[in-house]
Amino acid sequence: MRIILLGAPGAGKGTQAQFIMEKYGIPQISTGDMLRAAVKSGSELGKQAKDIMDAGKLVTDELVIALVKERIAQEDCRNGFLLDGFPRTIPQADAMKEAGINVDYVLEFDVPDELIVDRIVGRRVHAPSGRVYHVKFNPPKVEGKDDVTGEELTTRKDDQEETVRKRLVEYHQMTAPLIGYYSKEAEAGNTKYAKVDGTKPVAEVRAALEKILG
């Protein structure tokens, strides 16, 4: 089962990716992890990636596709894989197709921007333990304090409203066109495309995914 997850940052992909990995026994492939592993391994592709990153440039689509091909040929991907954060653009999706990387399901997590802003901006973290709260959906017992230690909670830089809105603009410009791309691919019988209502509670989203994936 080869799956691509689409959706804006904060749409709940991470939570459900965990569930899909456990239920279907497939690994999640993130391009960031893949690049780090390739550089660490010192492979030919890793060396190329390191040179590009050391020069402060963006790794080319060709190189990322080559890394994806190498990664999915590994034993743990025998039953499939879950791609999150890639492809991000139509040229990347085209390059994947040309490289013969076929996908069984493309799942779009649909959540309105304002709800995403609400979800992310309301997050508060206790940095030492990694505990995460939300002012509206999962508040601490005492406002601004960690339940266990009573220490101050903080807001991550990435969770500030300005940053979140900027990331959403980027998503709509770069990645949202993939929704049309994969809808057409599904019409042509090349993949299955499903839109998931990401505003629903976690358990309901999970049940919807089970129904789609079987």
From Swiss-Prot:
Pathway: Purine metabolism; AMP biosynthesis via salvage pathway; AMP from ADP: step 1/1. The modification N6-acetyllysine is found at K192. CDD domains: ADK. One of its GO terms (cellular component) is cytoplasm. It is found in: Cytoplasm. AMP binds at T31, R36, K57, L58, V59, G85, F86, P87, R88, Q92, R156, R167. GO terms for molecular function: adenylate kinase activity; ATP binding. Its EC number is 2.7.4.3. InterPro entries: Adenyl_kin_sub, Adenylat/UMP-CMP_kin, Adenylat_kinase_CS, Adenylate_kinase_lid-dom, P-loop_NTPase. GO terms for biological process: AMP salvage. Monomer. Consists of three domains, a large central CORE domain and two small peripheral domains, NMPbind and LID, which undergo movements during catalysis. The LID domain closes over the site of phosphoryl transfer upon ATP binding. Assembling and dissambling the active center during each catalytic cycle provides an effective means to prevent ATP hydrolysis. This is Adenylate kinase. It comes from Escherichia coli O127:H6 (strain E2348/69 / EPEC). The gene is adk.
